[in-house]
């Protein structure tokens, strides 16, 4: 009985979501997709055969450091740069987005050859860095502190684990438009198309590269290849990087720390093996 009631509630929520869309999209039907870790995702089918991707944003974006206005600003710029899929309808305040459908698989399902990945992502970063700099900044220390402050319960092992990192000094001398979540699931096709801009903000490009290295499981060598491809595409050392390069290595522990805190937050809201695996992995990296 409880399972049936839950299913009916889900069906009603989908009908309500569909009815909220403008014509002709409200005449379609929704097919739930494997959801991201914070959003609800659907394939929308119209009677004409046209398809679209519908994303329902997380109802509490502030909890995860998401600024919807900045997400929309960066997304629109990314469409202009050929990085993001066109949008048919959006409600930026709620994070609802209806996008053109893409049949190409993401890199988690069908990654390009490993040797092709650094130049492809270098091209993504070069176009990303042409966008106007957002006013909202995602500085790793403040961002991680926000996550930590929102924890309902701080694990007993966390203070000792974070002490050395919080006593260190991270690079803070370069700010560029960043996506902050260029993981394989957010890259579609060989192009690639970039989706899920909700963590986008001004950020340090070193954190962006460190995040790529961690989420793609790259070696230091592959990360350095990406850096070289980026600089070659700009004709050498570029003023955007203040002549110091990306300084990505300094941000690897910050990627692990923020990933740990994010997983702890999610596990408080929705306990499960996926979040526990992320907690265990990032904790081990920081030990």
Describe the residue ranges of each PLM region.
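Active-site activation/catalytic loop segments of kinase-like enzymes and analogous catalytic loops
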Residues: 206-238, 253-271
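ATP-binding pocket architecture of kinase catalytic cores
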Residues: 32-137
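ATP/Mg2+ or Mg2+-diphosphate-binding catalytic cores
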Residues: 261-287
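An alpha-helical support segment within catalytic cores of ATP-dependent transferases
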Residues: 8-25, 130-180, 184, 281-284
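A general structural signal marking secondary-structure boundaries and capping sites
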Residues: 82, 125-133, 168-169, 216, ...
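Conserved N-terminal boundary motif of the eukaryotic protein kinase catalytic domain
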Residues: 24-32
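Active-site acidic catalytic loop and adjacent metal/ATP-binding pocket
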Residues: 34-46, 50-54, 165-207
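Start-of-helix signal in alpha-solenoid helical-repeat scaffolds, especially tetratricopeptide repeats
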Residues: 68, 251-254
């Amino acid at each position: 009985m409880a399972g049936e009631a839950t299913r009916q509630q889900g069906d009603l929520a989908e009908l309500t979501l569909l009815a909220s869309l403008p014509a002709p999209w409200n005449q379609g039907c929704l097919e739930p997709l494997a959801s991201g870790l914070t959003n609800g995702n659907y394939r929308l089918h119209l009677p004409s055969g046209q398809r679209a991707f519908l994303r329902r944003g997380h109802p509490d974006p502030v909890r995860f450091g998401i600024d919807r206005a900045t997400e929309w600003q960066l997304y629109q710029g990314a469409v202009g740069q050929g990085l993001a899929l066109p949008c048919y309808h959006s409600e930026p305040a709620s994070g609802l987005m209806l996008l053109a459908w893409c049949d190409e698989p993401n890199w988690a399902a069908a990654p390009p050859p490993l040797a092709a990945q650094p130049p492809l992502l270098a091209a993504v970063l070069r176009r990303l860095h042409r966008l106007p700099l957002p006013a909202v900044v995602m500085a790793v220390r403040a961002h991680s502190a926000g996550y930590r402050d929102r924890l309902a319960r701080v694990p007993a092992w966390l203070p000792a684990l974070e002490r050395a990192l919080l006593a260190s000094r991270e690079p803070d001398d370069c700010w560029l438009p960043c996506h902050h979540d260029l993981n394989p699931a957010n890259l579609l096709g060989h192009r690639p198309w970039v989706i899920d801009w909700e963590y986008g903000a001004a950020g340090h490009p070193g954190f962006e590269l460190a995040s790529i290295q961690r989420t793609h499981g790259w070696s230091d060598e592959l990360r350095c290849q990406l850096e070289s491809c980026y600089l070659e595409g700009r004709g050498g050392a570029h003023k955007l990087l203040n002549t110091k390069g990306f300084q990505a290595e300094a941000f690897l522990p910050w990627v692990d720390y923020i990933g740990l805190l994010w997983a702890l937050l999610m596990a408080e809201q929705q306990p499960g093996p996926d979040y526990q695996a992320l907690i265990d992995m990032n904790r081990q990296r920081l030990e």
